């Protein structure tokens, strides 16, 4: 298959201040479909942060000949502050999460197709975000897997999710590789946060959480390498 990054931005018109869902977006995708993957047996999935369930149905309706499906992220706002920054977390609103998942299932019940996911290379680990990392880590991982695989759509299992890998909090900014997190840290310090408070916020949505080496064994460096890994485990 073929994943398309931020596909909802390919028709942006900056002068008109249109950055997503530009007027020619679906026209471009239809042309791309006809000229490249049409009549070929592979999957196409587009990343579309701006997509509503209705938008996702347009992208993935077979009759429109655009994409197989898109990643749309409505369910991942259930623990975020509306209009806030990405590190401004709030307690998980389970009702909102259920409503978002239900909307996707019903909107694409007959036309279009769902992608199913909890996490990716830019998001925190699902168990740390939606479950528990201590005594109930294994049960949390199983619960999230059952919830995901019980829905209609194509499931995407991010590496490490199948064994319940968790976030890897760090103590200082020197331990962070994620360039976005380092930039946000400087901004938080400039706004008056002390180092400890800034790191608490960074650890919530630091993209390094999803980019630590895959854990294969209980040996040093989780059996991933005999050398020095790029991130701590």
Segments from the language model and where they lie:
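Active-site and adjacent substrate-binding regions of carbohydrate-active enzymes
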Residues: 1-233
């Amino acid at each position: 298959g073929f994943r398309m990054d931020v596909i909802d931005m390919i028709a942006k018109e900056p002068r008109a201040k249109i950055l997503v869902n530009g007027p020619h977006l679906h026209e471009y995708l239809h042309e791309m479909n006809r000229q490249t993957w049409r009549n070929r047996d592979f999957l196409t999935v587009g990343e579309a942060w701006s997509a509503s369930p209705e938008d996702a149905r347009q992208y993935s309706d077979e009759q429109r000949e655009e994409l197989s499906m898109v990643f749309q992220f409505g369910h991942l706002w259930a623990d975020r502050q509306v209009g806030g920054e990405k590190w401004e977390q709030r307690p998980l609103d389970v009702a909102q999460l259920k409503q978002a998942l239900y909307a996707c299932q019903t909107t694409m019940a007959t036309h279009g197709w769902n992608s199913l996911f909890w996490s990716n290379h830019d998001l925190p680990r699902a168990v740390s975000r939606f479950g528990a990392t201590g005594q109930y880590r294994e049960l949390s991982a199983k619960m999230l897997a059952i919830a995901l695989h019980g829905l209609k759509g194509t499931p995407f299992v991010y590496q490490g999710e199948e064994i319940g890998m968790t976030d890897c909090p760090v103590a200082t900014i020197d331990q962070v590789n994620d360039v976005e997190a380092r930039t946000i840290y400087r901004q938080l310090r400039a706004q008056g946060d002390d180092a400890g408070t800034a790191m608490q916020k960074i650890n919530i949505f630091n993209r390094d959480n999803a980019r630590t080496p895959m854990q294969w064994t209980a040996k040093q460096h989780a059996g991933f390498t005999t050398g020095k890994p790029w991130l701590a485990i």
